Each structure stands twice: as C-alpha cells, then as structure tokens.
Amino acid sequence: MAEKGQKSLAVNKKARFDYLIEDTFEAGMVLVGTEVKSIRQGKINIKEGYARIENSEIYLHNVHISPYEQGNIFNKDPLRIRKLLLHKAEIRKLIGYVQQKGYTLVPMKVYLQNGLVKLQLGVGVGKKLHDKRQDMAKKDSQRRIQKELGQRQKGME
C-alpha cells in the first residue's frame, strides 16, 4: 500500500466508515517548521478534521497538531486553520463536488512523501445509520466465510 518514499503518519480509519468516499486527491499543506517536526513525530489527529472551500482555496479545519516540545515561542495554535495546496483543475473539480448536496471533504491520511508532508483528501457522502449497519454485517459475514475456508483448508491437510 505504501509507495516508495512514502511514510504514513496518521490515518483516519473512521472516514471510510462514516462516509462513502467517491474520489481522493493528494494535497500539500502550508505548515510552520515546528508543526512539521511535530507531525514527523506522529503527533497529529485528523479524525475530527474536514476541509472547506473559501475564495477558491481549500482550508483544513479542526485538525490538531500537538505543539512541538522544543518549539517554545515558535509553536502555533494546535487547531489553527491550514491552507491546502492543490492544482487549479483539482480545486475546480472539488468545488463541483461540494456544490452537490451532501458532499464533504474529509482528510483520509497524512504521510511524508520525499520529505514533504502530504494529505490525502477524500470526497464523500455521509452514510446513514442503516448503511453503516449493512457494511458491518457484510464485513462480519466475509470474516466468517474466510474463517470457515481456513478451517476447511487445515482439515484437508
């Protein structure tokens, strides 16, 4: 899953559970030096995060980057709004998605790629409770089937 030169730092596992993700985009983040050091240590929480489009630019909200211990006066607000860097064509595509009813921009994962902090941004529709239950039931049945197949394989040997 991890490509060459890519190190995963934070993954939002809840995103695929809460949203039906239709498309993903890779975005850079505008960060301060102490934030980068803190992210490299894995001190970032993207579970509650979301992105918004303001003046044809995309901003990341509600993502917590813990202050760097040795950063003292250079540390910024942990929950500050951060700008995301995408190509204009990608931003236009995202604007088109978000203008449709119910679409949300969700941070999927944060990773290092060739020394740069990148964010995988997912475009999705929120799932209803019954959709989540169906997905859980489907996963449980798949696990049961795999378990049965594994036991049969062991019995034949």
UniProtKB/Swiss-Prot annotation:
Subcellular location: Cytoplasm
Xref: InterPro entries: SmpB (IPR023620), SsrA-bd_prot (IPR000037), SsrA-bd_prot_CS (IPR020081)
TM regions (residue ranges): none
GO MF term set: RNA binding
Highest taxon above the source species: Bacteria
Coiled-coil boundaries: none
Short name of one Pfam family: SmpB
Sequence ranges of Basic and acidic residues compositional bias: 132-157
Keywords: Cytoplasm, RNA-binding
GO CC list: cytosol
Region (Disordered) location: 130-157
GO biological process, one term: trans-translation
Primary location group: cytoplasm
Disulfide pattern: none
Stated family: Belongs to the SmpB family.
Task of the protein: Required for rescue of stalled ribosomes mediated by trans-translation. Binds to transfer-messenger RNA (tmRNA), required for stable association of tmRNA with ribosomes. tmRNA and SmpB together mimic tRNA shape, replacing the anticodon stem-loop with SmpB. tmRNA is encoded by the ssrA gene; the 2 termini fold to resemble tRNA(Ala) and it encodes a 'tag peptide', a short internal open reading frame. During trans-translation Ala-aminoacylated tmRNA acts like a tRNA, entering the A-site of stalled ribosomes, displacing the stalled mRNA.
Protein name: SsrA-binding protein
Species name: Alkaliphilus metalliredigens (strain QYMF)
